[in-house]
Amino acid sequence: MNSLEQAEDLKAFERRLTEYIHCLQPATGRWRMLLIVVSVCTATGAWNWLIDPETQKVSFFTSLWNHPFFTISCITLIGLFFAGIHKRVVAPSIIAARCRTVLAEYNMSCDDTGKLILKPRPHVQ
Amino acid sequence: MMRTQCLLGLRTFVAFAAKLWSFFIYLLRRQIRTVIQYQTVRYDILPLSPVSRNRLSQVKRKILVLDLDETLIHSHHDGVLRPTVRPGTPPDFILKVVIDKHPVRFFVHKRPHVDFFLEVVSQWYELVVFTASMEIYGSAVADKLDNSRSILKRRYYRQHCTLELGSYIKDLSVVHSDLSSIVILDNSPGAYRSHPDNAIPIKSWFSDPSDTALLNLLPMLDALRFTADVRSVLSRNLHQHRLW
């Protein structure tokens, strides 16, 4: 195995890593958008719910019933967290971190875009 | 008389309630596992760029050799006094195997994400099972993992290993003569002692339900299939094998 072939192999290896992380971006962007929209809905809903003078007079469940917008967006937000949205919004960095864990064994690392970092072979003591 | 009957009734009720409670806990534990697995970011198959597709057509399809015990699964049999898994953890399946004319029950726990892992890597590699356990047990486990998907057809067992200094060494040339396109995934460094440049080490797994070692490997395995010689990457191994 000559060094030219090895370099070629490492390049192809790196290409797939960067390509994969790049491909993840649109989906991650959509998840982030969704999280922002639902969070903003929940926040506005909560504000309206809290400033409503009725909320303090009636029971908790009745007040929730009076503010369906808040109730629904809050349930959606909880559902999203159960489905792991907090991990999906950082998926590319999770994948990059996994790469780093495995590549460390091979004296390499990678940045958040998947670019390889080759480390010099340590001297045997 | 009345008192004894009352006590007896109460005792039956308590016993029944305890059974119901443990059943409930059992169900809950299963559900928690499902939720954890679902929450984790997995590894979706994403399309190849034209350059990568072209590259893939130029290189050979690789073989991935997989170990079973403590890599893909963990099992203990009913004779063990202190099982390594937390008591009460339900096994994924139970195997009944006859060894030396004695029927033995093996409680097998699948490593988290193993089904997903096998499904994904089977699209990239030709999978081969190579285990140091006995054929009768190894083939039953492989059948269960395969789940009639026909992805684990080639299998090698203890009789295909070479015994050296009390440990079983897996000779990859038995599986395939061309070492440029074969990779072995094993938790024990001793198993691939004769082919260190073809090895991917993995931490031994016993019971941790939040383990993601198999998912961690997916980006690396995805990228590795584009190399002409897997040793270009794998020979950079420092072999700082910790005793896992």
UniProtKB/Swiss-Prot annotation, chain A:
Keywords in alphabetical order: Acetylation, Cytoplasm, Lipid metabolism, Membrane, Nucleus, Transmembrane, Transmembrane helix
N-acetylmethionine sites (modified residues): M1
Pfam families associated with the record: Tmemb_18A
Keyword RNA-binding: no
UniProt xrefs under InterPro entries: NEP1-R1 (IPR019168)
Molecular function terms from GO: protein phosphatase regulator activity
Tissue specificity annotation: Muscle specific with lower expression in other metabolic tissues.
Highest taxon, organism lineage: Eukaryota
UniProt subcellular location: Nucleus membrane; Cytoplasm
GO biological process: lipid metabolic process; positive regulation of triglyceride biosynthetic process; protein localization to nucleus
Topological type in the membrane: Multi-pass membrane protein
Predominant subcellular localization, coarse grouping: nucleus
Keyword Transcription regulation found: no
A GO cellular component annotation in the UniProt record: nuclear envelope
Residues that span the membrane, as ranges: 33-53, 65-85
Entry similarity comment: Belongs to the CNEP1R1 family.
Family annotation (PANTHER family): NUCLEAR ENVELOPE PHOSPHATASE-REGULATORY SUBUNIT 1 (PTHR20996:SF1)
Subunit structure: Interacts with CTDNEP1; the complex dephosphorylates LPIN1 and LPIN2.
Function according to Swiss-Prot or TrEMBL: Forms with the serine/threonine protein phosphatase CTDNEP1 an active complex which dephosphorylates and may activate LPIN1 and LPIN2. LPIN1 and LPIN2 are phosphatidate phosphatases that catalyze the conversion of phosphatidic acid to diacylglycerol and control the metabolism of fatty acids at different levels. May indirectly modulate the lipid composition of nuclear and/or endoplasmic reticulum membranes and be required for proper nuclear membrane morphology and/or dynamics. May also indirectly regulate the production of lipid droplets and triacylglycerol.
Protein name listed in UniProt: Nuclear envelope phosphatase-regulatory subunit 1
UniProtKB/Swiss-Prot annotation, chain B:
Transmembrane portions of the chain: 7-29
Compartments in which it is found: Endoplasmic reticulum membrane; Nucleus membrane
Topological relation to the membrane, as annotated: Single-pass membrane protein
EC number: 3.1.3.16
Biological process according to GO: canonical Wnt signaling pathway; gamete generation; mesoderm development; nuclear envelope organization; positive regulation of canonical Wnt signaling pathway; positive regulation of triglyceride biosynthetic process; protein localization to nucleus
Pfam families hit by this protein: NIF (PF03031)
InterPro entries: Dullard_phosphatase, FCP1_dom, HAD-like_sf, HAD_sf, TIM50
Catalytic activity: O-phospho-L-seryl-[protein] + H2O = L-seryl-[protein] + phosphate; O-phospho-L-threonyl-[protein] + H2O = L-threonyl-[protein] + phosphate
Any one of the GO CC terms: cytoplasm
Entry annotated with the keyword Nucleus: yes
Keywords from the named record: Endoplasmic reticulum, Hydrolase, Membrane, Nucleus, Protein phosphatase, Transmembrane, Transmembrane helix
Listed GO MF terms: phosphoprotein phosphatase activity; protein serine/threonine phosphatase activity
Residue ranges occupied by any FCP1 homology domain in the UniProt entry: 57-224
Superkingdom: Eukaryota
CDD domains with a match to the protein in the record: HAD_FCP1-like
SUPFAM superfamilies, per database record: HAD-like (SSF56784)
Function, in words: Serine/threonine protein phosphatase forming with CNEP1R1 an active phosphatase complex that dephosphorylates and may activate LPIN1 and LPIN2. LPIN1 and LPIN2 are phosphatidate phosphatases that catalyze the conversion of phosphatidic acid to diacylglycerol and control the metabolism of fatty acids at different levels. May indirectly modulate the lipid composition of nuclear and/or endoplasmic reticulum membranes and be required for proper nuclear membrane morphology and/or dynamics. May also indirectly regulate the production of lipid droplets and triacylglycerol.
NCBIfam families, sorted: HIF-SF_euk
Recorded family membership: Belongs to the dullard family.
Complex formation: Interacts with CNEP1R1; the complex dephosphorylates LPIN1 and LPIN2.
Name the record gives this protein: CTD nuclear envelope phosphatase 1
Organism: Bos taurus
Name of encoding gene: CTDNEP1
